[in-house]
UniProtKB/Swiss-Prot annotation:
GO terms for molecular function: structural constituent of ribosome; tRNA binding. It comes from the Bacteria. Belongs to the universal ribosomal protein uS10 family. The keyword DNA damage does not apply. This is Small ribosomal subunit protein uS10. The keyword Ribonucleoprotein applies. Part of the 30S ribosomal subunit. The lineage of its organism: Bacteria, Pseudomonadati, Thermodesulfobacteriota, Desulfuromonadia, Geobacterales. Involved in the binding of tRNA to the ribosomes. SUPFAM superfamilies: Ribosomal protein S10.
């Protein structure tokens, strides 16, 4: 597994939950002897939704809602077999989406 790189992308709606998960991954990787680059904050995607407030006529009265998707990127350089095993056993929060590329 030498001279390889594991790239981990994390997405979540709650940035505090995301930072806790990133901290767990970085701590696990450093404990097993791998080098870690990151966490790199990626741009936050903001989806805005405009909804009519009333059920009938009044088009001028609207509500706006938004969903913010926060993203982080972590590169694990020179991972060992212990690093891969520890990352597979790691239990992250339910609100965090994880994408792993080798």
């Amino acid at each position: 597994m030498q001279s390889q790189k594991i790239r981990i992308r994390l997405k979540a709606y709650d940035h505090k939950l995301l930072d806790v998960s990133v901290g767990e991954i970085v701590e696990t990787a450093k404990r097993t002897g791998a080098r870690v680059a990151g966490p790199i904050p990626l741009p936050t995607v903001i989806n805005k939704y405009c909804v009519l407030r009333g059920p009938h006529v009044d088009k001028k009265s609207r509500d706006q809602f938004e969903i913010r998707t926060h993203k982080r990127l972590i590169d694990i350089l020179d991972p060992t077999q212990q690093t891969v095993d520890a990352l597979m056993k790691l239990d992250l929060s339910a609100g965090v989406d994880v994408e792993i590329k080798l």
